[in-house]
Amino acid sequence: MKIVVAGGGYAGLSCLMEIADRLPDAERVLVDPSRWHLRQTRLQEALRRSLDGLRTPFSELGDQYGFRHVRASPSLSRKALARASAAGRLAGEGIDEDFDALVVAVGLRPRPRPRQARWVGLADLKGTDGRRLVRRIIEEAGGPSDRVTIVGGGATGLQYLFELRDALRREGAKTRLALVDPGRRLLPGQPDEFHAYVAERMEQSGITYLGGYGLASAGDGELELKGRQGGVRRLRSAFSFSFTGMKGLSL
């Protein structure tokens, strides 16, 4: 039996490991255009160490868990998957693999960020040296009157917020920081005490917290925020990050 898994993120690798346990004799193939798996939940660590430390080559993982990696990015549209299913073969640029079962594990992508030059999103951080990014922020927005804004107060946004603050302070930057989040409180799935603790930490760290506001539009160095209860607020921001969650892949 031959099983092809498309997508080398956490879901795809978990699937391959589960298959290895349940069907150890099956031939297993991973299809992903990258050379390595990137631990996205720890991207904030790249602000203080090399991004290479968060990457594991698929070749090493394949040796460890018994699968073969094919670097390719075939179409996974509804029509392409229907053709592949009927033929029992996944074909496209860089790949031509028959299969008995095909698993598609590429369902989530970061929501797009505003296109202005001083905006960074999760997709950008996957290939960005964090320490160089800190130096860029200091060069372009390192003064006490400048502000760096994190839009999105989920787990990733919060981790990045505090890690970025520490990285800027280590370099002596006086840049102010702000967090913008549309929710009434942070991480609503957690107890109320968690929100209170994080809000207190932000206050102690001099971070401006704008809860109940979402991003309406982004201009040159200025954000237009829309409140949950109505009203519009404008915020000067010399550099901004977008951590507004993930969206599903349309098949």
Protein language model regions, located:
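Short, surface-exposed alpha-helical segments at coil->helix boundaries
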Residues: L51-T56, R131, D192-A199
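Rossmann-like NAD(P)H-binding beta-loop-alpha module
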Residues: L133-L177
